[in-house]
């Protein structure tokens, strides 16, 4: 997976905007993970509507407040913004664990062509080996939420034997005193999600008009 960004710099979306530039560091952050390539733009209303949905999706899978162990998931924002200021503004409220390409890196455009992205927003899901698992998961994320990951993981395991479980790589996660609270909150959130699924989308859904997307090319 790291080979996709070989020789490039990725930047962490934290306050210091730390650069991830060595091959070893890239491998540590991307290898043996499902990687989401999020194509979006701050000036795109559909992207603005979808961003909170994707943020919530990512946080619920990677934040230890919600899960005992972060999912094997990485996200790279591939900006289609016309200016660097718009890119920075769009990323300001997004998770610190997100990665993004420098604004002046032409790979931003090349990746759009490589993965045949025609409209925004778009989320390309890549297997650990770099092959495309889902060409655009935008609607799936909106419809299923974090449950998408289990489906992708199962498909990746069937199609790519290099996808290892976390216990094959790391020491068992230590349990904290907040574990019962996390478990209870997860159960409540899960039950609420199921209830909404039975009753239909509620009027407070943050998706907005994300069903209609902007043409890119």
Curated annotation (Swiss-Prot):
Residues 188-217 are annotated as: Disordered. Expressed in the retina (at protein level). Expressed predominantly by photoreceptors in both the inner and outer nuclear layer (at protein level). Not expressed in the testis, spleen, intestine, lung, cerebellum, or kidney. It comes from the Eukaryota. Keywords: Cell projection. GO terms for molecular function: receptor ligand activity. Residues 188-204 have a biased composition (Basic and acidic residues). The keyword NAD does not apply. Transmembrane segments: none annotated. Residues 1-164 form the Thioredoxin domain. GO terms for biological process: photoreceptor cell maintenance. InterPro entries: RdCVF, Thioredoxin-like_fold, Thioredoxin-like_sf. The keyword Cell membrane does not apply. Pfam families: Thioredoxin_8. It is found in: Cell projection, Cilium, Photoreceptor outer segment. Its main location: other. GO terms for cellular component: mitochondrion; photoreceptor outer segment. Plays an important role in retinal cone photoreceptor survival. In association with glucose transporter SLC16A1/GLUT1 and BSG, promotes retinal cone survival by enhancing aerobic glycolysis and accelerating the entry of glucose into photoreceptors. May play a role in cone cell viability, slowing down cone degeneration, does not seem to play a role in degenerating rods. Interacts with isoform 1 of BSG. Belongs to the nucleoredoxin family. This is Nucleoredoxin-like protein 1. It comes from Mus musculus (Mouse).
């Amino acid at each position: 997976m790291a080979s996709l960004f070989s020789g490039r710099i990725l930047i962490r979306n934290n306050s210091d905007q730390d650069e991830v530039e060595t091959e070893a560091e890239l491998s540590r952050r991307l290898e043996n993970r499902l990687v989401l390539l999020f194509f979006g733009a701050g000036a795109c209303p559909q992207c603005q509507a979808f961003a909170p949905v994707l943020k919530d999706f990512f946080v619920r899978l990677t934040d230890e407040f919600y899960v005992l162990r972060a999912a094997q998931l990485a996200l790279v924002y591939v900006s289609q913004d016309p200016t660097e200021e718009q890119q920075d503004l769009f990323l300001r409220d997004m998770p610190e664990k997100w990665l993004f390409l420098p604004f002046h890196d032409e790979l931003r455009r090349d990746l759009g062509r490589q993965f045949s992205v025609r409209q925004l927003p778009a989320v390309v899901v890549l297997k650990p080996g770099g092959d495309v698992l889902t060409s655009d998961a935008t609607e799936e994320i909106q419809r299923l939420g974090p449950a998408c990951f289990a489906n992708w993981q199962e498909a990746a395991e069937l199609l790519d034997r290099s996808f290892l479980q976390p216990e094959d790589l790391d020491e068992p996660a230590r349990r904290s005193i907040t574990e019962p609270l996390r478990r209870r909150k997860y159960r409540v959130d899960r039950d609420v999600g199921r209830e909404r699924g039975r009753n239909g989308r509620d009027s407070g859904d943050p998706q907005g008009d994300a069903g209609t997307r902007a043409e890119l090319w």
